[in-house]
């Protein structure tokens, strides 16, 4: 009985130790489970962070790709519009002074010419490079009150009462390289190179009278092709722009000052055109510079 008791005690005691060991094992397993859960949570968290970062990166890549695609579409649209305008010269966007002129009335045509010149005078002059007064006065002959280069920088006012032959001149050929484009867009040629002096005679018709004028080439000669050239001459108060091909005159534009106003004479083949641009009052500051020079 004692042995049974002892045995029982031993059993109970052993059972207690087993319980203790079991509780320790349970605690260890619980700790391991807790650690595993923590590690698993950290892994999940890392995966989520990694997934979120991938999503953000994908969004950024998509945004950049979408922006690039949009810019490419806009660029292609601009290029296609430009090419379409070239292939369709009579389109609304590419209409010039010489386009569809046969369909215009006389009043519409004159208004179109006026609008064209006003736009060129308003926007083209700002693109001209600035030049110093001394350089300008050096290469352009003095008029009654100022050098022609300074005169050509002025706010010219077209006098529509003195536009002779303009309609016939433009209706006969495209409007290009005439007074407005030559002076307000390209600018007066800067005579800053030394050339061998060359004299020439030009026959000019003015007020029904013919004049043979001697001109001295002090300007510049632009070679367009092997036998094609553009030359500038100055004499007195006149600037001449002459286009030649194999020595033959193709076109001529004369700019000359008369009583402070700028007169322009264009001649191309059998067509000619005369225009007058009135000059406003010159500023006192500019007047003082002219006197000093």
Swiss-Prot record:
Entry keywords, A to Z: Membrane, Transmembrane, Transmembrane helix
One Gene Ontology CC term in the entry: membrane
Subcellular location, principal: membrane
Topology with respect to the bilayer: Single-pass membrane protein
Transmembrane parts of this sequence: 55-77
Location(s), subcellular: Membrane
Name of this protein: Uncharacterized protein B0228.6
Organism: Caenorhabditis elegans
